[in-house]
Amino acid sequence: MERHDGEEYIPAIFGGQPPHASQVISLMKFSQETTTWNLPIMIAQALLVSEVIRTYPAELRMLHRLFQRKHPNMAEIFFILIKYLTIFAVIFDILVTETFAARTDFDCRSWAWTSSTFYFMCSTLVFCVIGWRARIIFRTSQVASWSLSVGLMGQFAVAMWTNYRVDKADALTPAGTCAPAAQVHADASQRNAALQLHFWQSSTFWFLLYNTIFESSILMACCIKLRKTSSGPSGLTKIAKVLFSNNVHYMAGVETCNVIELVMLLGWTSSLPPVHITSIAIQIVVGLQMLIGEQEAVYSPTCSQLSYSQYSSDSGGYINKHHAATSSSNGTFSTPSRTLSYVKRPGTGTTVADIGCADASGGGQHGRKGTFSSISSVPAYVKANPIVETVSPQMPSKAQSQSIPYKREVEVTVDMSPVPPPPGPSPAPLPAPYM
């Protein structure tokens, strides 16, 4: 096997003559500058390839749940689209930037455009995931729905405009590699024009600025909404805590990267390599992790009855029919004068704000169709028609108490309706007291 580190081209570079020290130094600097210029692209490729491999176990669990339900939910659709568009984008990007596979200008142009378009489509899909989560958190708010719709259309327009404007390796060089056509076919005067680029002329700057402002606004609004509507006695409820932490992690990762790149573009627009791919790669990685974390929280065994409510299938939300159909944690106790109902959940106080109870378990009445029940802080003791307690309830038998799985959600109903009189003639009235 031959060693391919570039040394085989050195004799051709210097015409077979022993190189001077200045020539060797210049060649080494050129090699280093080329590596540095392509570093953002290589970082993005490494991040995305590692993320694709890392998510396969979670994807297998997701496909197993999909096989059981026979139909996907919106989170699974978003995950599959983002992941496999990313795979194709990375493959074409590596072919263009790291190999000699291209043979014609058409190869470079088609692969470069496909890769770039898929990258920006993944960015828009991650933006759709954020908007979809926000729509569920804000429930039926028309203002939120219109704002998210307008923002999504704006993001898609800015993404496609940036995709059209950014440089792509769409021309074949004499060496057999792909490079931007402006470098391959343009003269020196056209090349120098790119060195006078200002930040407001950069489409990447406006793409990053739009994403940073709108995503940060949505995520901060979601955090405030969760704090207001999903706090119980011990803080945020279980699923609300997952949503809140994912929002914070997304802002800490993606928006911080965007702000750093925006500052760099403000000062050194003409001196920077393409940085939008690195930002999109971080956005994809955090977005996939956000989808995986929330799906695992919903469908994990410890959260089978403590997750999202029966979110309507026409809205494409989270739904867990298997858990709702197999719930066996309900108990009923009857005695003659009143009815008592309560829900017990480990790790909570007197509320079921974080319980996504299905209708079969009796807790669906507290949820709202099309929303997460984990976001509705309705105490268990709130009833539409409260009954005044007149007789204290009887304790259940020992056998019934042992059959209740206290480790999971338990709904107990004590029916104490009046006992009907026994059949037969009514008993004779008691004699009047002796006077």
Swiss-Prot record:
Glycans are attached at N330. The chain crosses the membrane at residues 33-53, 77-97, 111-131, 143-163, 204-224. GO terms for cellular component: plasma membrane. Residues 392-404 have a biased composition (Polar residues). Residues 418-435 have a biased composition (Pro residues). Keywords: Cell membrane, Glycoprotein, Membrane, Transmembrane, Transmembrane helix. O-mannosylated by PMT4. Is also N-glycosylated. It is a multi-pass membrane protein. Residues 392-435 are annotated as: Disordered. Induction: Expression is highly up-regulated during all stages of pathogenic development. Expression is positively regulated by the unfolded protein response (UPR) signaling via the binding of CIB1 to the UPRE motif localized at the PIT1/PIT2 promoter. It is found in: Cell membrane. Disruption phenotype: Keeps the ability to penetrate maize epidermis and to grow intracellularly at sites of infection but fails to spread and induce tumors in infected leaves. Plasma membrane virulence factor required for spreading and inducing tumors in infected leaves. This is Virulence factor PIT1. It comes from Mycosarcoma maydis. The gene is PIT1.
